[in-house]
Amino acid sequence: MTDKELTGYHSVLNIFLLLFLHWPFVWNWHWNVFEELEILSIFVLFVVVWDFLWFVLNPGVSLRDFGPKRVWWHKKWKAGVPADYWSGILFSIVLFLPETIVVDPIIGIAKILILLLVNLILTTLTIALYPKAY
């Protein structure tokens, strides 16, 4: 997404996460392209939420530190958050579009909304319940 350096740690961790998310296919899920795109959509949104929660849960930083002055490794910011977050959310939605268009628009839109709302609710609860965030 950006020109940030990908470390060995992040490479191995992302591979592990992708393998973990594909685990249901081992247990009798029938693979198809729509299921694959759904897994990738979940992964992309997970990475965005995970990156943000680092600021919420890390005892060495505060949510007050979340901004372009202190978070120098995110080069581009839009509307108060890293541009990568907006790109990730949009890409996560785009990955659901083929299923939404081809299979069932109602179910596809419902899956997108559920994915976004569940992550928003859980992130909001984490911020509200974790005392270091404020």
Tell what function each PLM region has:
Residues 1-134:
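Aromatic-rich, lipid-facing transmembrane alpha helices and their immediate juxtamembrane interface loops
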